[in-house]
């Protein structure tokens, strides 16, 4: 195959034409790395490497734009890239490259998720669900959850905000159900309500 044209479309984007037929969208970095020029001859392996490296470079730039706007886990990033039309191998390459260069970090992301949902007074089981949904590996869960504030203080805070009368049984049932949906165990909820009620009795 012969490079019959190299056309620049933006500061870092080019289109390389092979045999006056196949157009490959690529980047300046790839063109430089492959030392392409008009008239350059490529064997099948070199042409395939050009296609692969071009797809990876464009997908990598797309991924960098994505992680500049919000945090992603490796799995989230892979899945999102596939949704946007990248093939699975290219998406996996991008996630690995970004992780290797420090642009994504599942451990840091897990800790951020725990802090975010703990601040919303969510319990451990609900936070575990959020970690799982985002594709965070289980081995990172416990490390991140170890940084979570104690349940007691979060539960007490929630009860103060939502249960003005701890002796109103209907209100207690409603608040208890809400806390269970937030990921707290029934044992933790019952203990917290009892302690909260005792404060009123002592008063």
Q: What annotation goes with each model-predicted range?
A:
Residues 1-203:
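An alpha-helical, amphipathic repeat domain used for nucleic-acid recognition
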